[in-house]
């Protein structure tokens, strides 16, 4: 009886680990496939505008307005 209970507990733990790892691997695969797909590669070009290192006078004025 103890052996059957131990096997049941081990089976439940392994099944829980498998179901959680499947969700994690699915999320990782979705992220990788979105980066490598045509749309993912086209969307990466949009991020170039975010890393503009120049701060204009309009940016400074806007920041001053926010900080008031």
UniProtKB/Swiss-Prot annotation:
Name this polypeptide is given: Pantinin-2
Similarity remark: Belongs to the non-disulfide-bridged peptide (NDBP) superfamily. Short antimicrobial peptide (group 4) family.
Record keywords, A-Z: Amidation, Antibiotic, Antimicrobial, Cleavage on pair of basic residues, Cytolysis, Fungicide, Hemolysis, Membrane, Secreted, Signal, Target cell membrane, Target membrane
Top-rank lineage group of the source organism: Eukaryota
Residues in the signal sequence: 1-23
Propeptide: 40-68
Known role: Amphipathic peptide that possesses relatively strong activities against Gram-positive bacteria and a fungus, but has very weak antimicrobial activities against Gram-negative bacteria. Also exhibits mild hemolytic activities against human erythrocytes (16 uM induce 8% of hemolysis).
A GO BP annotation: defense response to bacterium
Residue positions where Leucine amide is found in the record: 36
Subcellular location: Secreted; Target cell membrane
Keyword Signal belongs to the record: yes
Keyword Lipoprotein attributed: no
Predominant localisation class: secreted
Gene Ontology terms: cellular component: extracellular region; membrane; other organism cell membrane
Tissue: Expressed by the venom gland.
């Amino acid at each position: 009886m103890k052996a059957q209970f131990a096997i049941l507990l081990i089976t439940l733990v392994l099944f829980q680990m498998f179901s959680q790892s499947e969700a994690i691997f699915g999320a990782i695969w979705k992220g990788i496939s979105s980066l490598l797909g045509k749309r993912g590669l086209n969307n990466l070009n949009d991020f170039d505008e975010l890393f503009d290192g120049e701060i204009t006078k309009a940016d400074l004025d806007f920041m001053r307005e926010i900080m008031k």
